[in-house]
Design a protein with these regions (language model features):
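AMP-binding/adenylate-forming catalytic core of the ANL superfamily
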Residues: 47, 52-53, 71, 78-126
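Short Gly/Pro-enriched turn/cap motifs at secondary-structure boundaries
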Residues: 9-16, 32, 64, 69-70
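Adenylate-forming
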Residues: 1-4, 20-22, 50-54, 97
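Active-site loops of AMP-binding adenylate-forming
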Residues: 1-10, 26-28, 56-60
C-alpha cells in the first residue's frame, strides 16, 4: 500500500490490485458472494507474475494450487471478506488439528488465547 494514499485497516490486506480478482469459495468450490463472509481464498483469473510452476516439481505445483478447485488458483488460505470488501487471511486451511472429530484451525486457537490480556503472543502446533 502507498502511505497516506491507500486506505488500510489493521489486520486486513488492502483492496485487491487492479486485474486481480480474489474470490471466496466453500469446500465444494462454490463461490461465496457478498461481504461479511468467510471461505477459502482463490484467485479467479490469471495475472502477470502469477506462479505457474515450481522448478523441478511441476506436478506438486499443479496439485497444490490448481487442482483443488476447477479453473481457480487456490492460495491454500482461509479468508474472510468484511463489509467493505477488505480481505483478512485467517490461516492456512491445511493447518488444522482434529479434536473429537472437529477440525479446528490452529490460528483460531491462537486468536482465542491471545484475547487474554496477560498473553503477549502464542503459537499452537498440532
Amino acid at each position: 500500500p502507498l502511505a497516506n494514499v491507500t486506505p488500510i485497516k489493521p489486520c486486513f490486506a488492502t483492496l485487491p490490485l487492479p486485474g486481480i480478482q480474489p474470490i471466496l469459495v466453500d469446500e465444494k468450490g462454490e463461490e461465496i458472494v457478498g461481504n461479511g463472509v468467510s471461505g477459502n481464498l482463490c484467485i479467479k483469473f490469471p495475472w502477470p507474475g502469477m506462479l505457474r510452476t515450481t522448478y523441478g516439481d511441476h506436478e506438486r505445483c499443479r496439485v497444490n494450487y490448481f487442482a483443488t478447485y476447477d479453473n481457480l488458483y487456490f492460495t491454500g488460505d482461509g479468508c474472510m471478506r468484511d463489509e467493505d470488501g477488505y480481505y483478512r487471511i485467517t490461516g492456512r486451511v491445511d493447518d488444522v488439528i482434529n479434536v473429537s472429530g472437529h477440525r479446528i484451525g490452529t490460528a483460531e486457537v491462537e486468536n482465542a488465547i491471545n484475547m487474554f490480556s496477560d498473553v503477549v503472543e502464542s503459537a499452537v502446533v498440532g
